Amino acid sequence: MDKQIIKLENIHKAYGDEEVLKGISLEIMEGEVVVLVGPSGTGKSTLLRCVNQLTIPDQGRVWVNGMELTDPSVDINLARQHIGMVFQDFNLFNHLTSIGNVMLGLTKVLGLKADAAYERAMKEMVRVGLQEKCDSYPGQLSGGQKQRVAIARSLAMDPILMLFDEPTSALDPELIGEVLAVMKDLALAGMTMLCVTHEIGFAREVSNRIVFMEGGVIVEEGTPKQMLQNPKLERTKQFLGKISEFH
């Protein structure tokens, strides 16, 4: 883990009078899995969206794989091709089949011919265990299956980094495991991942680092063992203890 994939330096973001991010700095190395936790409204999702510039910070700088994305001269669309993002509400096109959704970026963004795009998309559908659902439309899939299609769509673009914004929060409890299993497989394969999630079991088992945010700042960060068994701050212990009861 000696190659830096994400570097955030003094990130600030406000919406009107509300300062959501108050000078966040964070570095993530290649192959690292980092889980962001914290109360609602703490700025976790905003920070995640600053990484690929879906949200533009008011102040601060963002680097991904050595490229400064906050540099106005950077081709942000080109940079985003290498950053996968999975949202809590799937963001699939309902008029396309599962494999059509996975192929879309390959044909429209990368310019692959249909045969090559289909082959690459099918490989990722197999990877997430949905090869039997290639011709199904999103309306015919469970929430867990939709999220796995969304993950396959990101993976098909061969990203160097995956961002997950509460990928299981919209799912029925019995469907959460199938999505977490895919995420675990990605982590074991060495994918660099930044995840906003309260799935503490996943964080304990898979992550290298847990980052606790509150009030727009990083309160504490450390290994899962340190954060879950022996955090330095009472507030960290209180919050992680509470969400551990439910996850």
Kindly give the residue locations of the regions a language model identified.
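C-terminal boundary and immediately downstream tail of ABC-type ATPase nucleotide-binding domains
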Residues: E221, K225-H247
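ABC family nucleotide-binding domain
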Residues: K3-P224
